[in-house]
């Protein structure tokens, strides 16, 4: 019984990576420094049917180590709560209309920091993730899947133009690298 000699080059070749469910069905778009606040980056997952899922980008301060989320609130003002959004029918009647800068929720951390998460996309609010109200930790554990913030449906006419002010994955990675270089050069 002879054994074939092992090919050392084959051991070094990486296995073809299977794309995640999110990467397979969604295109990632990013909005860096939302409302001029440094590092407060948002990620918009756009499906081919134009639905957009609003999540936190990996560099957002809430997702950094050491942060603990105390609570999350969809109560934007005394008269406006995203939880009151009731959508019905084929034409999504009753959905709240959002602009790019419309606040979706507020995240309160145990260190006293407060972060307002914005829509980044014009459209109708389809749903908010009520699961993060009861278990805020999933926002940090699974930000692109179970820890999403909200689902927004852009107007059909605007569905192609919503990505104009957003960054691609590669452009966003370049922004993060520049940010890291700037902080290491300053220290």
Swiss-Prot record:
Family stated for the protein in its record: Belongs to the ABITRAM family.
Biological role: Actin-binding protein that regulates actin polymerization, filopodia dynamics and increases the branching of proximal dendrites of developing neurons. May play a role in transcription regulation.
InterPro entries: Abitram, GCV_H/Fam206, Single_hybrid_motif
Species per Swiss-Prot/TrEMBL record: Bos taurus
Quaternary organization: Interacts with F-actin. Interacts with G-actin.
One Pfam family here: GCV_H
GO cellular component: dendrite; filopodium tip; growth cone; lamellipodium; nuclear speck; nucleus
Cellular localization per UniProt: Nucleus speckle; Cell projection, Lamellipodium; Nucleus; Cell projection, Growth cone
Keyword flag Nucleus: yes
GO molecular function: actin filament binding; actin monomer binding
This protein's UniProt keywords: Actin-binding, Cell projection, Nucleus
Protein name: Protein Abitram
GO annotation, biological process: dendrite morphogenesis; regulation of actin filament polymerization; regulation of filopodium assembly
Gene3D superfamilies linked: 2.40.50.100
